[in-house]
Amino acid sequence: MRTIFASLTVPNYRIYFSGTLMANMGQWMARTAQSWLVLIILTHGNAAMLGWVMAVNFAPLLVVTPWAGALADRMSKRRIMVTAQIVMAIDAAILSTLVLTGIVQLWMVFVISAMDGLAGAFYSPATQAFVPELVPLKNLPNAVSLNSASFNGARLLGPGLGGLLIAAVGVGWVMAINVVCFIGFISTLLLIKADRLYTSPPASEKARVRDGIRYVKRRPDLVILLTIGFMMGTFGFNFNISDAVMATQAFGKGSGEYGLLGSLMGIGSMAAALGAARRKPRLRWVELALLVYTISMGLSALAPNYGTFAVLKMFVGWGAISTLITANVMVQTSVTPHTVSYTH
């Protein structure tokens, strides 16, 4: 047990962890609410349109992240994170207000989703590079795994709670809760003590995107791991779309059952994260996890009813998150501090 939660003995990381848990809860509830808003309320079952909303949100990650990673190597990572979170909180507040006032339209969701994705593209590499500053190097694999445990612990509760709240109080109020969670996370970032960070010396030359590409080219192992992460992130993590369509159109279920699918996936994801926190990252774990993920996804596509599909979500969650955590830890512990931010 001490091994699993070793990084929580570091005060700065403990503050950060509590904030991410709060933010992740809000995000998972909001993702459930936004998917329901687009698929059921605004488009009356148009899954393709929901896919486009997700694509608009994800596109900045592909385009901007390499340059954002180089920026994170030169500037205060915490400042970038706080700024990005403020922008995302404003986006969430605007969308919540539009829904609660009844004037929301699909094009508005597209614009807000794009802005949110752009802010996330700056936040992601900054937080990847910030985590190594929160803990001693020996605790880094554990810290990365606990970050995933926070994310997937929120996945365990967030979607199910979000689905129930949609039925009880409506989509707009679920999004309003997300705004409160953003404010809480921003507050915890500001509480982290700068004099207790494990900062590394400045790089000998400015971090540039081409430096990161050149570094990765010299490391075939990183090419494999980053390719796995890219392929899964691009093609394998469309659960907000597939789960919503399967729950509502294939099985005729409501918002509660849709949210439950995310929570069941969270059970497997949480088990994967806690398991990764205890063991050393090895390539064989990536191979095993990919096999479990592939088989369970294939069986999910053939599921004859909601119950079977729901049970398989736990195996999908374990396989997907085990793959990504192990690959992530292997990357973070095998690169120099100045390349962490632009190899993600």
Regions found by a protein language model. Name each.
Residues 1-13, 195-226:
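Juxtamembrane intracellular "pre-TM" segments in multi-pass secondary transporters
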Residues 14-32, 54-72, 76-92, 108-167, ...:
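Substrate-agnostic recognition of the 12-TM MFS/MFS-like secondary transporter fold
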Residues 33-59:
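Extracellular/periplasmic helix-loop-helix junction of adjacent transmembrane segments
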Residues 35-41, 96, 100, 157-177, ...:
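Transmembrane alpha-helix termini and helix-breaking/packing motifs in multi-pass membrane transporters
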Residues 63, 74, 80, 87, ...:
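C-terminal transmembrane bundle of multi-pass solute transporters/carriers
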Residues 133, 181-203:
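Helix-loop junctions on the cytosolic side of multi-pass membrane transporters
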